[in-house]
Each structure stands twice: as C-alpha cells, then as structure tokens.
Design a protein with these regions (language model features):
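Outer-membrane beta-barrel biogenesis signature
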Residues: 21-54, 156, 226, 244, ...
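Outer-membrane beta-barrel translocator domains and adjoining extracellular loop/strand segments
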Residues: 55-60, 86-94, 127, 137-145, ...
Length: 300
C-alpha cells in the first residue's frame, strides 16, 4: 500500500504540473499571426484506472506525435501498468487464513502508428492503425510476447449539445479503451465495438454512456495481470495463462460524468459493468493534451 500511495502522489503531481503550466501561459492583448493549428506536434498524457472488488488496474500512457495537416498524423508511445490485488481473509471452520496484497508493475508494449482524419459538419471520421512491439513482461501479463496490430475507426456527429458516436475495429489483442483498463492481455483476432453518446450538461460539464462488445475469432490466449490470483471465476482470475475460443468474448456498458475546465485537460469519472465477466467497477481517466499546450505557446 505504501507503493500505491507513492504511485498516486506521482500521478497527481504530474497532473498538477500540467495544469499549472497551462495557467501560466499568457494571453496576448493584441492579435498574433496564427500558426497553422492543423500542423505540428501532438502529445497526450493520460492516467486511467479500473477499480473493483477483484483488483485495481492503473495505467499511465504517454505518447508524442506529429500532425502533417488536418487529415494525417503519426504518433508513438508507451504505457506503464500498475496491477494490485487487495489483501483477503478466508475463514474455514475455526481456521482463518490471510493473504497479503500483491502488486505487479512495469511497462507495456511500445507502440507507434498513424491516424487519418476527415472532419465534417455532417459526420466526423478518424481512423488509426497502431502497431506494438512486445516490450512488456509476459509473466506479469503486460504483453503476449508477440507484436500487436490494431485498426480502429470512429464516427461522431454533434447535434447541439448531444454527440452520438460509434467506434469499431479489428485487432489481434483486446485493447484498453479510454474508460476500461483490462486485467489481462490477449493474443488472438478480435473485433471490438462501442456505441454511445455524450451530452453537455453545462459549460465544462458532460455526461455520457456507451455499450461495448468484444467478439473473438478463433483461439484466444489470455495473459493475466493478476497472476491468476484473482477472487473471481474468470479465466484471468484463476490462471496466469489460459487458452480457449471464447475467453475474450465480452459485452457491457459504461456511464460517466466529465469535467473539462480547460481545453488541455479533462477528467472522467464513472461506472463500468462487464455483463460477461460479472464485474462492476469504478473507472476514471485524467487526460492532458500536452501537444495543444505546446502549440498554443508557439502562437505567442
């Protein structure tokens, strides 16, 4: 738990530093020559987590990239995972056994990719192809030991304050979403889908919901981030590595509220429910648009 406290302290300090830096940026009193906002450096820093009675999975994801224009860009990054199993107490008859808290931490797979965007008042589209290298530990469940490939597409359109969206993709591993940090890493062909909408409640405040599905094709191999020591009955709870055809099949839903006090950072808090794995979780995502901050400084 001491390590967990240090981890949270580091994440909060990093978030605070970015917010302070944004607050120190001076707004010019006179119009300036505008730098092309569609071209230049991009970068995101996110701290997200999923917490339930079975486990606590956290991820810090850092990436940098470059947009060549409003339609095409490239990026690269690396995630750092922190998986914690809380201590448990089991009573059998007159005997009580206690199991201490266990922790896994380390980097995941380094990734790079490109993004294609087609903004439009009628329908916004963005598609990304991401390739990852097996730099994470397979024994800790942070990698499958094989290269990963993901192709994701997102469509959305805003109707005043309401923004419906659809996201779908093909991959050889089940990806984390912006609101769900998974307790395992998988190897095997899957399709991943998410449909939902977000509504602006007031200035800076939003609420949203979505449903998601993961559909596997053929054999799946699952590497547990819990080292097979989870309290549940799912494959990633009971075994460090498991193989089967439907191990990654899943459907569920997310609900969230979001606070966006400035354009460079956003905090989401919510609830996620996996119907397939029978897991109800608290989830959060703190995201900082470092690239936008750097671009804004170039305008002054």
């Amino acid at each position: 738990m001491k390590y967990l406290s240090k981890f949270f302290a580091f994440a909060l300090l990093a978030a605070g530093a970015s917010v302070i830096a944004h607050g120190q940026a001076q707004i010019p009193s006179q119009p300036q020559v505008k730098v092309d906002a569609d071209k230049g450096i991009t970068g995101f820093e996110s701290f997200q987590g999923t917490v339930n009675s079975d486990s606590r999975i956290f991820k810090i994801d850092s990436n940098l990239g470059w947009d060549f224009n409003k339609h095409f860009g490239v990026f690269a990054g690396v995630p750092v995972y922190f998986a914690n199993l809380p201590s448990t107490t089991t009573t059998t008859g007159a005997t009580t056994a206690a199991t201490g808290s266990t922790t896994n931490s380390g980097i995941g797979n380094v990734y790079l990719g490109f993004i294609v965007k087609a903004p439009s008042p009628k329908l916004d589209y963005a598609g990304a192809v991401t390739v990852s290298a097996p730099t994470g530990s397979t024994s800790k469940g942070f990698s499958t030991g094989r290269a990963g490939v993901d192709w994701t597409n997102r469509f959305e359109r805003s109707f005043d304050r309401l923004t419906p969206f659809f996201e779908g993709g093909l991959s050889n591993t089940v990806p984390d979403s912006a609101f769900l940090t998974r307790p395992f890493t998988s190897l095997g062909a899957v399709s991943h889908l998410e449909e939902g909408a977000e509504y602006q409640l007031a200035k800076h405040f939003y609420a949203g919901g979505s449903g998601y599905q993961v559909v596997p094709f053929g054999s799946q191999k699952v590497f547990s981030k819990l080292d097979g020591k989870g309290k549940g009955k799912n494959p990633f709870d009971s075994a460090a590595v498991s193989t089967g055809n439907d191990l990654t099949r899943e459907n569920g839903f997310n609900t969230w509220v979001a606070f966006e006090p400035a354009s460079i950072w956003r905090l989401e808090l919510g609830y996620t429910r996996s119907m397939t794995f029978d897991l109800s979780s608290f989830a959060f995502n703190l995201r900082m648009n470092v690239g936008k901050l750097l671009r804004s400084k170039r305008n002054y």
